[in-house]
Protein backbone atom coordinates (compact mmCIF):
# COMPACT_ATOMS: atom_id res chain seq x y z
CA UNK A 1 0.00 0.00 0.00
CA UNK A 2 2.85 2.41 0.80
CA UNK A 3 4.32 2.07 -2.69
CA UNK A 4 0.90 2.56 -4.26
CA UNK A 5 0.31 5.72 -2.21
CA UNK A 6 3.80 7.06 -2.99
CA UNK A 7 3.28 6.40 -6.70
CA UNK A 8 -0.02 8.29 -6.80
CA UNK A 9 1.32 11.11 -4.61
CA UNK A 10 4.08 11.56 -7.20
CA UNK A 11 1.52 11.79 -9.98
CA UNK A 12 -0.49 14.34 -8.01
CA UNK A 13 2.68 16.38 -7.26
CA UNK A 14 3.42 16.55 -10.98
CA UNK A 15 -0.17 17.52 -11.84
CA UNK A 16 -0.14 20.23 -9.15
CA UNK A 17 3.21 21.55 -10.45
CA UNK A 18 1.77 21.62 -13.98
CA UNK A 19 -1.20 23.65 -12.74
CA UNK A 20 -3.71 20.93 -13.52
CA UNK A 21 -4.82 20.26 -9.94
CA UNK A 22 -5.51 22.49 -6.97
CA UNK A 23 -2.51 22.96 -4.68
CA UNK A 24 -3.50 20.47 -1.98
CA UNK A 25 -1.35 17.97 -0.07
CA UNK A 26 -0.42 15.28 -2.62
CA UNK A 27 -0.06 12.58 0.05
CA UNK A 28 -3.59 13.22 1.28
CA UNK A 29 -4.91 13.30 -2.28
CA UNK A 30 -3.26 9.93 -2.89
CA UNK A 31 -4.95 8.44 0.17
CA UNK A 32 -8.34 9.87 -0.84
CA UNK A 33 -7.94 8.50 -4.36
CA UNK A 34 -6.53 5.05 -3.54
CA UNK A 35 -8.59 4.03 -0.48
CA UNK A 36 -11.90 3.58 -2.35
CA UNK A 37 -10.11 1.69 -5.13
CA UNK A 38 -8.65 -0.78 -2.64
CA UNK A 39 -12.05 -1.15 -1.00
CA UNK A 40 -13.67 -1.97 -4.34
CA UNK A 41 -10.95 -4.51 -5.13
CA UNK A 42 -11.63 -6.13 -1.76
CA UNK A 43 -15.34 -6.35 -2.53
CA UNK A 44 -14.64 -7.96 -5.91
CA UNK A 45 -12.25 -10.45 -4.30
CA UNK A 46 -14.90 -11.58 -1.83
CA UNK A 47 -17.95 -11.19 -4.08
CA UNK A 48 -16.98 -11.60 -7.76
CA UNK A 49 -20.63 -11.36 -8.77
CA UNK A 50 -20.48 -7.64 -7.82
CA UNK A 51 -17.74 -6.82 -10.35
CA UNK A 52 -20.00 -4.80 -12.67
CA UNK A 53 -21.35 -2.80 -9.73
CA UNK A 54 -17.82 -2.14 -8.46
CA UNK A 55 -16.60 -1.05 -11.89
CA UNK A 56 -19.47 1.44 -12.06
CA UNK A 57 -18.63 2.74 -8.57
CA UNK A 58 -14.96 3.02 -9.60
CA UNK A 59 -15.86 5.05 -12.68
CA UNK A 60 -18.02 7.39 -10.59
CA UNK A 61 -15.31 7.70 -7.91
CA UNK A 62 -12.61 8.68 -10.41
CA UNK A 63 -14.90 11.20 -12.15
CA UNK A 64 -15.95 12.81 -8.85
CA UNK A 65 -12.40 12.90 -7.50
CA UNK A 66 -11.08 14.75 -10.51
CA UNK A 67 -14.05 17.15 -10.59
CA UNK A 68 -13.24 17.99 -6.97
CA UNK A 69 -9.49 18.55 -7.37
CA UNK A 70 -9.19 19.85 -10.93
CA UNK A 71 -7.93 23.42 -10.99
CA UNK A 72 -10.76 25.57 -12.21
CA UNK A 73 -10.01 28.62 -14.28
CA UNK A 74 -11.30 31.88 -12.79
CA UNK A 75 -14.29 33.38 -14.54
CA UNK A 76 -13.47 36.49 -16.55
Feature names for model-found ranges:
Residues 6:
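Alpha-helical elements of the RecA-like P-loop NTPase motor core of helicases
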Residues 9-18, 26, 32-76:
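C-terminal peripheral helix-coil segments that are non-catalytic and often amphipathic
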Amino acid sequence: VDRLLAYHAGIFRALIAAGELQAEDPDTLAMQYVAPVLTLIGICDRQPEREAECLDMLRRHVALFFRMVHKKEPLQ
